[in-house]
Amino acid sequence: MQIADKPPPLKVDKLSVNRSGQLVLDDISLTINRGEFVGLVGPNGGGKTTFLLTILGLLKSKSGTIELYGHKKVPNSILGKIGWVSQHASNIPKNIKITVKELVQLGTLNSSNMFWRFSAEQNQQVSKAIELAGLQSVENKNISNLSGGQRQRAVIARALASNAEFILLDEPLVGIDRDSRNSLLKFLDKLCHEAQKTILMVSHDIAAIQQSSHRMIFLEERIRYDGAADCFPSLADLANLRGIKPVHDGIDSPDELYQLESMGDKE
């Protein structure tokens, strides 16, 4: 529930976006309130990443408005509340020697400590972020020696160290095993419930979104579904949505990973 008199982290009204002369997002309207864990799903080319990049101001809209914490023209003080973790953020080359703690410290870097001189407050932010991510036991390990799930938590902790309140995640579940996936999802749920963070996560993994997020949005140029994650239509019903078919590998089970495929262009 939205706290009275405080604007929501995100409010989008009648947003449309073109890319390469093609309409990718059409008439998108939604509000995401504080403390929500929202899963954004849809086919390749459906506009998910385009939506995130437009929120961040990296792409221009054709029409419509985006408000972050009540601001259409977002000041730096509000930008500091936004944490962005791209799909490839955890793909750190093995020849780069950096520990978990050093990676998380990057989240606090600014003009006052660009030479890695951290105040007591900044060190406290780093310690808190590492604790929230459950990485205390590996904070001095090289990031390349961690599991895929631990690396994802580390890059999210970097965003937390900057005091981000609204975290945007692009495909954080790609390339990690089931146990790491479940651990990461529990961590994200904890951030919402205990730390009152707001999360918007893009994923192709519908089963994971249904199990973990509070709300699911199905985006394919337009919003096709916006509601409780556990009330989302069954995978068999996805064939009724234009250009979509459910695809799975392996044996049928409740925990099976599903992806959405489309013949459309990549987003």
Task: Walk through the language-model features, giving the residues of each.
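H-loop (His-switch) and adjacent beta-strand-loop-beta switch element
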Residues: 216-228
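Conserved ABC ATPase "signature" region
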Residues: 105, 120-138
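ABC ATPase nucleotide-binding domains
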Residues: 230-267
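Helix-to-loop junction immediately C-terminal to a conserved catalytic motif
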Residues: 56
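Conserved ABC transporter NBD signature motif
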Residues: 64-78
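Catalytic Walker B motif of ABC-type/P-loop ATPase nucleotide-binding domains
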Residues: 167-171
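H-loop/switch region of ABC-family ATPase nucleotide-binding domains
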Residues: 203-204
